[in-house]
């Protein structure tokens, strides 16, 4: 045993003593399932849309002593501490009895603000601003001269030490003159430009965004129903708000097909919050009683070319009311918004939602069945070429939101991204067709959806689940080795994507020289010409290479994203010229010559590729049942 000197002993004791206040401070932050005494008054002034500045005033009941206020860190739909950047929170001043109270940021948690409340102070007033992005490189634009979104998690502080559902707020909101608004919160009245809402707990408040705008239109999607469902739209121009009767009917059918699938609802009313804008850039996120949908101004006017976007967004966010918000992974049932989430079951939360979003969208007529097939082909091809599965399992990609927080990746085909969305969808198609096959087409994943997500009709409180719960629910529909079935697909390394569900549905993935309409629409929407399955890259409208595929011909030639393509075989680059060169090389022996620029360097690369253009499609397997047709069939 090594003896210590008196000086060493004193040093150790002093370090231990210094650690005690830190431990005690962290213990004080730990949430407890007890009611917060009093109601927090929250006033948000959102009238300065020109500068996109939101001013906030809070009055928080307090008692004398140390108090910690938290700024929300974790956002459920983002699956990470992404959400709104703490750097956009500014101007914090705390006062008590009109005297300024100095706050100090917690040394172990930058989202926590400590303040010593003097004796005799019963309320602390907090004033600050949320400086929402003014340019796209700062984050999503949530305020324009015509519209705004209120995300309460960016606009409040809340006391540490309590479960979120035990902290009550009384919110109010000041809007620009003559603007109209919608959201899940219940209004108690308006006084001038200020709207007052009923008291609500913190968990429900953060799950209840408000959309408001100069040009606003509400459409009842379930007329006469006891539980209303509305499409609430704000737009850059009033003309953007006009849809045809057939287009509106597709949204109404979406609601009915979801009800027929799940047999339940978990909201008092539901609002499809939709921003039709080329300036507002917040894409979308799910909530239990509403869904945010950021679409282009041409949502209605260019209807046929935006089918994928409707199923990837509008129906997807609606399905989340059941899958993700009501039924929620147990490791995401945290006590407040500053406790870390765990994302192990995102292949259910997002993967199954992606599957049902496409299926229910097709059943409702929101998307054509042929487009859904072509979209499925594109998904299958993308993940069949996702070479990164050789080292990284799909299960591990559920950590991706926390790792990258959706920052761009240089080599996504090798690194992998949030693959649990679309590859998760392939797994659920696999499960659906397996149930149909084993049951002689008497049962399907529809039965799982009703039995797992459709329980306890009308309940709002989240109901957690584990991997074992998913397996048990599948076995209740169709006995099978579901645990090993799922784990093989979640933990495996290929080769290739899990495409058994496509084959079992009576189709197979092939490649032809002609893109599908779906593929062309996606290229137009992304402003990219996609050569992923031939040369191994995409080219944007400026000629820049994007998403160079790992181990593709382009990769082997030494190319990366960021190169600008200047010429093809000695002629100025055009997308059609490159397509023609790839086609010509299919019957010749000469390599394809590309002149490119990266920064101030010019390079010429000769790619020895002779296999033609390749675009994914699904074709029928003769003599097999067409289970895809059955899956997309509207429920009666």
Regions found by a protein language model. Give the residues of each.
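Non-catalytic architectural context of zinc metalloproteases
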Residues: 34, 47, 59-61, 81-267, ...
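Juxtacatalytic substrate-recognition/specificity segment
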Residues: 58, 220-346, 352
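Bacterial N-terminal signal peptides
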Residues: 9-20
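Early extracytoplasmic/domain-onset interaction patches
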Residues: 26-75
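Intrinsic-disorder/low-complexity, polar/charged segments enriched in Ser/Thr/Lys/Arg/Asp/Glu/Gln
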Residues: 39-41, 53-57, 66-68, 112, ...
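Post-HExxH zinc-binding segment in Zn-dependent metallohydrolases
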Residues: 291-300, 326-327, 338-389, 595
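Bacterial N-terminal signal peptides that target proteins for export
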Residues: 1-11
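C-terminal recognition in membrane/secretory proteostasis and scaffolding
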Residues: 357, 367-636
């Amino acid at each position: 045993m090594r003896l210590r000197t008196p000086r060493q002993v004193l040093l150790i004791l002093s370090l231990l003593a210094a650690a005690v206040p830190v431990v005690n401070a962290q213990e004080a932050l730990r949430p407890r399932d007890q009611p917060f005494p009093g109601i927090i008054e929250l006033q948000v002034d959102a009238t300065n849309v020109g500068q996109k500045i939101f001013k906030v005033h809070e009055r928080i009941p307090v008692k004398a002593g140390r108090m910690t206020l938290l700024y929300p860190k974790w956002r459920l739909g983002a699956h990470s501490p992404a959400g709104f950047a703490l750097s956009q929170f500014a101007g914090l001043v705390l006062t008590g009895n009109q005297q300024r109270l100095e706050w100090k940021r917690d040394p172990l948690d930058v989202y926590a603000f400590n303040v010593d409340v003097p004796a005799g102070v019963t309320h602390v007033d907090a004033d600050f601003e949320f400086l929402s992005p003014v340019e796209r490189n700062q984050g999503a634009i949530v305020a324009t001269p015509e519209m705004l979104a209120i995300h309460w998690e960016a606009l409040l502080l809340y006391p540490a030490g309590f479960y979120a559902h035990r902290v009550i707020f009384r919110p109010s909101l000041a809007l620009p003159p003559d603007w109209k608004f919608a959201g899940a919160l219940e209004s108690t009245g308006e006084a001038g430009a200020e709207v007052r809402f009923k008291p609500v707990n913190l968990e429900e408040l953060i799950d209840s965004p408000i959309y408001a705008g100069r040009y606003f239109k509400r459409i009842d999607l379930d007329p006469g129903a006891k539980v209303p469902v509305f499409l609430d739209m704000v737009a850059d121009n009033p003309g953007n708000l006009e849809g045809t009767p057939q287009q509106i009917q597709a949204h109404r059918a979406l609601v009915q097909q979801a009800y027929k699938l799940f047999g339940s609802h978990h909201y008092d009313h539901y609002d499809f919050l939709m921003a039709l804008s080329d300036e507002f850039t917040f894409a979308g996120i799910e909530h239990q009683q509403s869904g945010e949908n950021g679409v282009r101004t041409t949502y209605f006017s260019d209807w046929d070319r935006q089918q994928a976007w409707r199923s990837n967004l509008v129906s997807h966010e609606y399905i989340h009311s059941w899958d993700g918000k009501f039924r929620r992974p147990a490791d995401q049932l945290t006590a407040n918004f500053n406790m870390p989430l765990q994302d192990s079951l995102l292949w259910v939360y997002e993967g199954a939602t992606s599957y049902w979003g496409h299926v229910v969208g097709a059943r409702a007529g929101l998307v054509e069945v042929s487009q859904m097939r072509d979209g499925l082909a594109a998904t299958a091809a993308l993940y069949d070429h996702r070479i990164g599965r050789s080292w990284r399992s799909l299960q591990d990609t559920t950590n991706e939101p926390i790792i990258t927080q959706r920052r761009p990746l240089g080599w996504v085909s090798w690194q992998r991204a949030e693959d649990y969305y679309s590859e998760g969808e392939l797994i659920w198609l696999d499960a659906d067709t397996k149930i149909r096959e084993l049951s002689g087409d008497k049962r399907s994943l529809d039965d799982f959806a009703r039995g797992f997500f459709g329980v306890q009709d009308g309940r709002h409180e989240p109901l957690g689940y584990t991997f074992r719960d998913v397996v048990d629910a599948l076995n209740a529909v169709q006995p099978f080795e579901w645990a090993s079935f799922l784990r093989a697909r979640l933990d495996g390394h290929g080769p290739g994507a899990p495409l058994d569900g496509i084959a079992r549905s009576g189709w197979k993935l092939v490649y032809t020289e002609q893109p599908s309409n779906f593929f062309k629409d996606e290229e137009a929407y992304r402003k990219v010409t996609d050569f992923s399955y031939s040369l191994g890259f995409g080219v944007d409208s400026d000629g820049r290479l994007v998403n160079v595929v790992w181990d593709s011909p382009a990769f082997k030639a030494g190319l990366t994203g960021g190169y600008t393509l200047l010429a093809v075989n000695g002629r100025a680059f055009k997308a059609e010229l490159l397509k023609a060169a790839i086609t010509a090389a299919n019957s010749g022996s000469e390599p394809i010559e590309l002149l490119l620029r990266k920064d101030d360097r010019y390079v010429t690369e000769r790619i020895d590729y002779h296999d033609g253009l390749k675009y994914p499609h699904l074709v029928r397997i003769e003599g097999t049942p067409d289970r895809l047709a059955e899956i997309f069939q509207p429920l009666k």
